[in-house]
A protein has these predicted regions:
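Short alpha-helix boundary/capping segments
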Residues: 7-15, 135, 152-156
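Active-site activation/catalytic loop segments of kinase-like enzymes and analogous catalytic loops
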Residues: 140-173
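Active-site acidic catalytic loop and adjacent metal/ATP-binding pocket
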Residues: 88-143
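ATP-dependent phospho-/nucleotidyl transfer catalytic cores
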Residues: 3-8, 33-108
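Gram-positive cell-envelope targeting signals
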Residues: 21-24, 64, 79, 100, ...
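Charged catalytic carboxylate motif
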Residues: 15, 19, 78, 142, ...
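ATP-binding pocket architecture of kinase catalytic cores
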Residues: 1-35
Length: 177
């Protein structure tokens, strides 16, 4: 019997990152029945932008606005500007280079990497479950989702973040993910 990765046990989180790095190495150039189809990163950014605009427009049209809606609308512009600034750093050429890298290395991701899908067996050995969202993407996507979940629960510990990245990078250099 196994148990889920405990987000408050730093050692388990670090070991989970090592296992994720090994999984990512194994998930490159998988032999599948379907041709490899990389995500289009530029299209993904545009889709996320459109979702944010739709959410804002929906909330603007509400006749009765609760406290959360009012706070969201007040904060929206500031976050929207930060989104645009972040996107300006990732110009089209940079994103196209990432897409080429993804296609060349045929990277796959778990797609739903969180503590609930990382199972500890006999203390240290781990396995992963729930691969329903497995797909072609930059593997940093899994790293991001897992780290965000863990760091939220650990008060955004910079020391833990450093250890997690170092443990992943010891197996799969971050620039290759």
């Amino acid at each position: 019997d196994g148990f889920e990765c405990n987000v408050l046990q730093e050692r388990q989180c670090i070991e989970a990152m090592q296992c994720m790095a090994k999984l990512h190495m194994a998930m490159r150039h998988l032999q599948t029945q379907q041709p490899y189809q990389a995500d289009r990163l530029l299209e993904d950014f545009k889709r996320k932008d459109a979702e944010l605009v739709r959410a804002r427009n929906f909330m603007r049209r509400l006749s009765r606005k609760d406290e959360f809606t009012l706070m969201f609308l007040r904060a929206y512009e500031r976050y929207w500007q930060q989104t645009k600034l972040a996107q300006s750093f990732l110009d089209a050429a940079c994103l196209q280079a990432l897409e080429r890298k993804q296609l060349t290395e045929e990277m796959y991701v778990h797609g739903d990497m969180n503590q609930h899908n990382i199972i500890m067996l006999q203390g240290k050995v781990m396995t992963f479950r729930n691969f329903e969202k497995l797909g072609a993407h930059l593997q940093m996507k899994d790293v991001y989702f897992f780290m965000r979940k863990i760091l939220e629960k650990n008060h955004w510990s910079v020391a833990l973040a450093d250890q997690m990245i170092e443990s992943y990078a010891a197996i799969t250099p971050v620039e290759h993910a």
